Amino acid sequence: MKRNIIIVTGGTGFVGSNLISYLAKKTKYKIISVDNYSSGSKKNEINNNRIRYIKGDTKQISHLLNRYKNNINSIFHFGEFSRIYQSFLKFNQCIESNSIGTHEVFNFCLKNKIKLIYSATSATLGNKGKDKDLSPYAFTKAKNLELLENLNKWFNMKFEI
């Protein structure tokens, strides 16, 4: 089994698109972006025959990536709702993306033994962790970090922050 694919969720956002650009230049991996384009942009897509863009939601990641699952080396998960102020205004969208969608990504990685690289935030790590309950965004990110630690303990899930 050749694991020659890297997945980037949120691949048309600022961080994801810059990571894809870097990976395309510095590695030989095939790269697949999964993005719902809620804050990402088609303008950030890179024209390269090793890069594929899939429009979709992380809540359906198992369905979207099922055909690639045996060839995926790692998943960089940047495809979350990432606005502190807006997480109060769009609470349901924040929970759907950061809790439900992210848990689907975690489960897909766990089930298929794929290493996860998860994007943390100063909203949960800053101020010695005391700010983790200040917004729905920070709360969901803090709970996801806690869940990852437990998935590692319980199931030896491989991840990096």
Language-model segments: residues:
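N-terminal Rossmann-like NAD(P)+-binding domain of SDR-like oxidoreductases, especially those catalyzing
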Residues: 1-161
